[in-house]
Amino acid sequence: MNLSPREKDKLLVAMAAVVARRRLERGVKLNYPEAVALITDFVVEGARDGHSVADLMERGGAVIGREQVMEGVAEMIDEIQVEATFTDGTKLVTVHEPIR
């Protein structure tokens, strides 16, 4: 299987999001990379499902709460920018204060 660097990055984020979901199910608090991966995956998959940029910007901040991440993680993430593929092309989605 020949994957471009971008495709490899997408798979890495998706796998990290799977790990993050499993940890949340077990009640384990997420670290920085897991939290970012989970929110990023939400945005990418939401774009594929047909949601709008505005909708994903808003809903991206409700994926995980402060109580689900390790101490200090929420303060480390001011915004997350995700380049996602929508039905009408690739767009940049910015989620401000993604962990509330």
Curated annotation (Swiss-Prot):
In terms of Pfam families, this protein maps to:
Urease_gamma
Domain of life, per lineage: Bacteria
- Specify where it is mainly localized: cytoplasm
Q: Which GO terms describe its molecular function?
A: nickel cation binding; urease activity
InterPro entries assigned to the protein according to its UniProt record, in alphabetical order: Urease_gamma (IPR012010), Urease_gamma/gamma-beta_su (IPR002026), Urease_gamma_sf (IPR036463), Urease_subunit (IPR050069)
SUPFAM superfamilies in the record, alphabetically? Urease, gamma-subunit
Quaternary organization: Heterotrimer of UreA (gamma), UreB (beta) and UreC (alpha) subunits. Three heterotrimers associate to form the active enzyme.
Q: Which family does it belong to?
A: Belongs to the urease gamma subunit family.
User: Can you say what this protein is called?
Assistant: Urease subunit gamma
Read off the lineage from the record.
Bacteria, Pseudomonadati, Pseudomonadota, Alphaproteobacteria, Hyphomicrobiales
